[in-house]
Swiss-Prot record:
Residues annotated as signal peptide: none
Compositional bias annotation for Basic residues: 1-15
Disordered: annotated span: 1-30, 56-114
Cited Pfam families: DUF4502 (PF14950), DUF4503 (PF14951)
Single Gene Ontology BP annotation: positive regulation of double-strand break repair
Stretches of the chain forming a coiled coil according to its record: none
Noted disease: Ovarian dysgenesis 9: An autosomal recessive form of ovarian dysgenesis, a disorder characterized by lack of spontaneous pubertal development, primary amenorrhea, uterine hypoplasia, and hypergonadotropic hypogonadism as a result of streak gonads.
InterPro entries: DNA_repair-scaffolding, DUF4502, DUF4503
Induction comment: Up-regulated in vascular endothelial cells treated with IL4.
CC annotations in GO: nuclear chromosome; nucleoplasm
Subcellular location: Nucleus
Protein name: DNA repair-scaffolding protein
Organism: Homo sapiens (Human)
Amino acid sequence: MPRGSRARGSKRKRSWNTECPSFPGERPLQVRRAGLRTAGAAASLSEAWLRCGEGFQNTSGNPSLTAEEKTITEKHLELCPRPKQETTTSKSTSGLTDITWSSSGSDLSDEDKTLSQLQRDELQFIDWEIDSDRAEASDCDEFEDDEGAVEISDCASCASNQSLTSDEKLSELPKPSSIEILEYSSDSEKEDDLENVLLIDSESPHKYHVQFASDARQIMERLIDPRTKSTETILHTPQKPTAKFPRTPENSAKKKLLRGGLAERLNGLQNRERSAISLWRHQCISYQKTLSGRKSGVLTVKILELHEECAMQVAMCEQLLGSPATSSSQSVAPRPGAGLKVLFTKETAGYLRGRPQDTVRIFPPWQKLIIPSGSCPVILNTYFCEKVVAKEDSEKTCEVYCPDIPLPRRSISLAQMFVIKGLTNNSPEIQVVCSGVATTGTAWTHGHKEAKQRIPTSTPLRDSLLDVVESQGAASWPGAGVRVVVQRVYSLPSRDSTRGQQGASSGHTDPAGTRACLLVQDACGMFGEVHLEFTMSKARQLEGKSCSLVGMKVLQKVTRGRTAGIFSLIDTLWPPAIPLKTPGRDQPCEEIKTHLPPPALCYILTAHPNLGQIDIIDEDPIYKLYQPPVTRCLRDILQMNDLGTRCSFYATVIYQKPQLKSLLLLEQREIWLLVTDVTLQTKEERDPRLPKTLLVYVAPLCVLGSEVLEALAGAAPHSLFFKDALRDQGRIVCAERTVLLLQKPLLSVVSGASSCELPGPVMLDSLDSATPVNSICSVQGTVVGVDESTAFSWPVCDMCGNGRLEQRPEDRGAFSCGDCSRVVTSPVLKRHLQVFLDCRSRPQCRVKVKLLQRSISSLLRFAAGEDGSYEVKSVLGKEVGLLNCFVQSVTAHPTSCIGLEEIELLSAGGASAEH
């Protein structure tokens, strides 16, 4: 096989993929078939080059070629004329063009490398479309049929075809003006990083380099010397165009940064910065040793005020002479007591956790920026900082510091940034209002001019919340407000809080890790949820009132698909009670009241720490939009078919699981409440198909107030008001935005729903096939078996009921109680017993009941033997009275079995049941 040729696959079968060697003395292919050129072939070749080179830039000074110098390639590319020494070549030899197809791994001659290096300096990029391969294949077909003047050969190097040396040719060549065409139709994934360029010298016709690295070969087109000809010509089919597109950083699985680019340099800078900071914190002890020296370069400042500005923490500081711990130390700073403005990044501020009156050491390399018109210098590059804490104040600092207190944020207008006097002087002043946020910082008196921010009393109030959001954007609204009515007030857990923090609260304070929320509605019907820093007792006073919202900030825009919970609450307030206003009109429209669909979006708002303000508007007609929750009885709620809707009711809690005896046991857990009311207990009012009790599931996301938590920890039954609970299949769910209250609010009440007092003892449903899990029922049956594997007994203290008694040898085997610190002479014996019952209501079912101590004592009263032990046969066949049981499990496969646990209902004077 000739040099430079490669084996072709079996799939690449074409009639013109053959070898055509030329013998010595034979005329070139171009001369023999010169008369076969047609206008159609020239036109097709011209169209192909025009498609591929639409982006070529026209160069000035390209005169038309003579008839003797027009080859196929030169005719359609309009190259520059030849040098003068070649104008005397014959017509046959001047039209000869040799395109060399070579592999990308073959070695080029020295002159090729030199010329390519010269041409790389003036490359111009032109995008090459993907159909360039198809145009190339079609051109090759026309070459075979009509364009016989082109000779195609495959060789490794054609340096021997030139009689001149490389230095002579380089001296004769003018400055090349090359064009680089990117070829993106890559056939090899391993060569994606190679350059696919087409180098065309528009000045010199000696050499034309065509490199296709994506095709794993290099194409060199040059004008051969008429005295030397190639001894063999090999025709090869170019690679077929494939559907594989180049991998870009957007669709590449492994994204790589461009070497030497800006992204790589920034990435390296960030890595070096993090490494330097980590290394400095690791070697912080060695820096402490240099504090006493005069050339340490450590800047010691005292923080006077902190605020956030443009995602940076700005600290107004006072420069100190030295460290407060060492009065003899001297700082490098020559001006003790001078005012400084220190900038901390978000990461540095999070690590430093500085507060007013804290002392901070700033280690080099810090920089000082002095602004000519500024009030004080600015300290930059504060990556290496350390807070100084005295030993006697270390414990107090840890107790006083509260990371949850947000820093005040200052929004600076563009007029203040660019000192536009026409806007800054005439713009209304904005007042800083801190609603429920503790002020952190002291007055800055070192020449710092704080901008007076005051909300004008004549702030225009709009009727549409949507108009304010669209005009003001997601930022705070310093100069605009909206009139709303507060429809609901509830608590939501904070995003970074857990339910376990609720157990730490006591008294009448709000649970920790929660925030008060207001569901507001404007005059046009748009709803919004406002997150506040108020206490719930203060926020509840706003329900049903018309208020003005000023200085709000949009946190999120939610839809029904994302947040279904808030829209289930909005649906209970729709349609509106009065006609709504149309944006842009002063008077409400009667048609809007009934023809508007329910809202599909809602804005989550928050009060700006400095600008947020909520004021009650007296005698505003928008308060008529308020719709209090409609209270229903449990009988009506069970007869409703609308699942997923909100409902409000009064009910008496007769049992809860788990039994919470202390507030310390309240954690982020689910609670099951069994409730009932008069409509389910009275025979005259209740439907026999309805249950006598109803299950209420309290989800972990439901925030419970301190009063409700104390009531759940007690043993007495309590009546609760369930506000905006979710209706589910056979139960009620208390989820987010559900409120549980002990006191009865002044709300509209349906007849029969306000009576919370039960007429007598609580009646339960009997066990049957329809009894669900997590419900309570009454059971009566005959003992048919005992679970001996789980039966055991243990002694407890007769004074305090402690079950962890110790038996000491020095007390002659007597038990001692650690809680009472005394010897227990007569301990009480407790037993654990589970029996199987034969119930008439479930004849084919295996009923297993875990008995209470009272039922066990009654069952074993006359079954004890002479030695104090009990025989199983002594309890078989005994009747068990009416037991109140909690359904723990119901299984139907492989056998029908029900697991019950005997419980004791909450009574006014009783204690919790012992299990």
